[in-house]
């Protein structure tokens, strides 16, 4: 998996189709040096069969379901490639921007698979234990010096899977190791929330043929209650056809 990810990363860099993100992007926290960015490899579902098992990993999925409920939807699957000299990402919550008020329960959970060893030296993700129970605070307050001191840098070997719920404050650290640190993030939602990646639109045809019916459920190819039907009716993942035409104008 690490070899396939590195190949994909280098290929996207070569053809300049990869994504970049500033450490402060979207959070209202100003930074000074434009070049300090993280590279992202989005939508890994299309980029190697080895990534498909992360949709419903048998050891991980039950933990996600324990946290946010039996029915889950994959929000996104992508890799963070943090080079030496990257900008430290602002502390943030994955769940809070989706709703305008604090929630007493998580509807989102994140799994981070460590493709590299993680340590404070190479910018291991910073987490604030217990912050999922905090009252709502804004991003500038959360990134004040007093709050930053509460963050703990992740230290764990490659191959580890780290799981946290969507209300926990976290963010990438500063990489000063001289090497790239890579992690794969798979985020899950309760299925009433719109995912980050539109899987029905973005999954390539040759990949769709390899995905199991269980995985299609998790990718949102089936309705949730009365949500997500086609022409008002439910469609099972087995019968899902993105090219199926909807009923148009008719006359007697």
Label the predicted regions:
Residues 1-91, 97-98:
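Non-heme Fe(II)-dependent double-stranded beta-helix
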Residues 62-63, 88-155, 193-203:
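Catalytic core of non-heme Fe(II) oxygenases with the double-stranded beta-helix
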Residues 73, 105-107, 178-180:
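A short, structural micro-pattern
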Residues 73-76, 126-127, 163-164:
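A structural signal for short, well-ordered beta-strand segments and their strand-loop junctions
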Residues 76-79, 111-113, 184-188:
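A structural signal for short, well-ordered beta-strand segments
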Residues 77-79, 130, 166-168:
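Short, well-ordered beta-to-alpha junction loops that form the rim of enzyme active sites
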Residues 83, 115-117, 188-190:
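Non-catalytic surface loops within mature trypsin-like serine protease
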Residues 134-139, 143-163, 167-168, 173-252:
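Conserved double-stranded beta-helix
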């Amino acid at each position: 998996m690490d070899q396939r990810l590195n190949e994909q990363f280098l290929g996207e860099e070569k053809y300049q189709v990869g994504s970049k993100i500033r450490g402060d992007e979207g959070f209202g926290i100003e930074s000074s040096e434009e070049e300090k960015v993280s590279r992202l490899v989005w939508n890994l579902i299309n980029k190697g069969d080895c990534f498909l098992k992360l949709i419903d990993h048998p050891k991980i999925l039950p933990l996600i379901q324990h946290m946010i409920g039996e029915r889950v939807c994959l929000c996104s699957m992508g890799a963070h490639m943090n080079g030496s000299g990257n900008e430290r990402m602002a502390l943030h919550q994955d769940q809070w921007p989706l709703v305008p008020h604090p929630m007493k329960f998580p509807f989102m959970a994140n799994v981070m698979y460590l493709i590299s060893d993680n340590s404070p030296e190479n910018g291991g993700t910073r987490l604030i234990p217990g912050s999922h129970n905090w009252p709502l605070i804004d991003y500038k307050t959360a990134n004040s010096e007093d709050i930053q001191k509460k963050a703990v840098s992740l230290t764990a070997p490659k191959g580890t899977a780290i799981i946290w719920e969507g209300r926990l404050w976290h963010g990438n650290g500063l990489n000063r190791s001289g090497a790239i640190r890579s992690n794969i993030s798979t985020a899950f939602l309760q299925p009433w929330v719109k995912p980050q990646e539109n899987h029905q639109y973005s999954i390539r045809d040759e990949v769709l043929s390899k995905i199991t019916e269980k995985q299609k459920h998790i990718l949102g190819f089936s309705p949730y209650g009365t949500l997500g039907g086609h022409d008002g009716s439910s469609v099972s993942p087995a019968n899902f056809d993105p090219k199926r035409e909807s009923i148009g104008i008719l006359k007697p």
